[in-house]
Amino acid sequence: MARINLRNHLLEMDFEDVVCFSNGRELRAHLKLRDIDLLLMDFHLGQHKNGVEVIEEVQKAGLIKNSTSIIFITSDRLPMIVGQIVDVHPDALIIKPYTINSIKQNVTRCLDLRHFMMPILKQMDEDKHEQALITLDEMLKESENPRKNSSLVKLRARILIKLGRYDEASKIYKTILKGSDKIIWAKWGLIQSYHLNGQVEESEALLLDMTDTQLTNDKACEWLARISIDGNQYGKAEEYMEKIRDGELSLNAARLKAYIYQAQERGSEAIELLEKKRESNRGIRERFDELSLDLARCYLNEAEGKASNERDDKLQVAKFLIGSAGRKVADPQLTVKKDYMYALAALLEGDKKKANEILARPGMDELEGADLPTMTDAISAWQTAGNKVKAIEILKICQQKLAAANDSNEKTISAMLVAKNEETIGEKKPQALAYNKEGLERFVKKDYQQATHCFYQAYLLFPREIAFSLNLLQGMVDAEVVKYETIDTLRFLKELERRQLTPGNQKRLDVISAKISDNQEIFGEQTDAPSAE
């Protein structure tokens, strides 16, 4: 009823073409057919994904243009909700209850600004960002309207980031923050500029400041966790994610936390987290289906780590979850996604004939519009089925997509999955084994410094291989090194203590840990285990 009333009011304001949608699926279907000039989006969409999730999806799919104005409407004043809305850069935010006059003012203002900036926005839509910047600078010289100038400066920083001119973007954000250090979008822009420019320490310092306020804590912790993952510091990443209450974890944040658990061989905790999240979203079918597939991946991963005669229970649960996802939805992409997971399950069951039958189904080669997790499933399936050429072909497409993806939880998760595929089919493993072999030879000769160097190179190529990690820690301890390159000894020990190890590896880690404790004069200065830089 609220949508119909709003539509009627817009028609009364002389808007001729006004279309209503009840959920994101309806909007996506419409956007595939025609463009929209202005989108008024409510945050709460009933038993469907919320407005922010919908906007993120259509932006990622390229269904919404830079020239489309977005106005968010919500009755929710919670910092967590407002923060999520601000993150998608709407042109305006209207808090309910609203008046028709306030709607009219906001819509008119957004469309006026859109018309003013259209020459720039059209060039951005055509991916002509260099030309868009030239046009923007010309308009900035001519404009005398402070409000429009402010929007132009904000857009200029975004274009500079798109062009990889991070230092120039940083200067803009710093100038804005000098005027007021409470402009949140400028803080996020500065953090992004620093991060993309490789200034990790600067971005981390700003992010730590952002954890002090409720409005920005969750996003800052997620970002800090991603930075930690980039440095293979999964224990540290987990600590940041623990600062977000489970009930306030977004869908992508829950996925990120689950993959952090899996990276530490703690699959049971990943399953427990995703099961809770899935159950709490039972009433929101789209999220429920996605979480069912995420959970199925966890069970497939757990089954892969077991002996072939111990996989049945995990595989049965995985297949049930795959089948339950989108049961009533006719979506070709979802069908392909599920079929690749079914193929993996068949391969883990040892039924290669069934797997090949699934892989031969129509549409299984059509991965252009597939998401990265589906593509990594496809790589694993083709590789395990014996078609390494096909697996490498998809891996290359995957790497290109990953390079072009925006920095986000999803990109970090996908990078972890792609890295796993690279380890399986790439050239890294033989090289890592060669470094490890040389390291062992030097270690036997008590050349601990050079042994540590070799173990470190093997670790960089295969950071999740526990043998390489233990060898590196052993080398550092015997070389009496507090820190080697990016690895801090005590922080690294803490990381390894979080992982689920075999009895043999656990015994070895205990011996190394005892040796560190016996050498307090060397390692005692860093009892707080500061993070690697």
Describe each PLM feature range.
Residues 1-20, 25:
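Two-component/phosphorelay signaling modules centered on CheY-like receiver
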Residues 5, 80, 98-107:
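C-terminal output helix
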Residues 20-38, 46, 167:
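Acidic, metal-coordinating helix/loop segments flanking the phosphotransfer/catalytic sites
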Residues 42-59, 66, 478, 482-485:
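Conserved phosphotransfer microenvironments
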Residues 167-389, 393, 398, 411-413, ...:
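Flexible loop/N-cap segments at domain edges
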